[in-house]
Amino acid sequence: MSQKVQNLYEGMYVISATLSDDARHKALDRIQTGITGHGGEIKKLHEQGRRRLAYEIDGHREGYYYLVYFTAPSSAISDLWQEYHLNEDLIRFITLRTDEVMEKIEFKTLDEQQ
């Protein structure tokens, strides 16, 4: 039997800021369990904390941001997206294919970018 190809993905998840700490951790566990349940493996998790949203989304003005690097078969991504759409605690998400895991997240100021 041939083994399915595991691609590396970067997922950004915004979880509702109205949840209790316990409920928020359960929502994050649900995301991680979904990934591993579809044959994926979590490589790195960056907790970005509570942040103001750029614009209001379904009545939410703030959310907890999580950046997750994981491997999974490409066939799992559409199944994960379906699960994410049904997760009421998840305000927004995006999943992108990437080439490397960022061990440390740093942002440049506007002056540094010019």
Curated annotation (Swiss-Prot):
Alphabetical GO biological process terms: translation
Stretches of the chain forming a coiled coil according to its record: none
Keywords recorded for this protein, A-Z: Ribonucleoprotein, Ribosomal protein, RNA-binding, rRNA-binding
Pfam family, one: Ribosomal_S6
Residues in the signal sequence: none
Entry annotated with the keyword Lipoprotein: no
HAMAP family with a match to the protein in the record: Ribosomal_bS6
Reported function: Binds together with bS18 to 16S ribosomal RNA.
Similarity comment: Belongs to the bacterial ribosomal protein bS6 family.
Protein name: Small ribosomal subunit protein bS6
Species name: Protochlamydia amoebophila (strain UWE25)
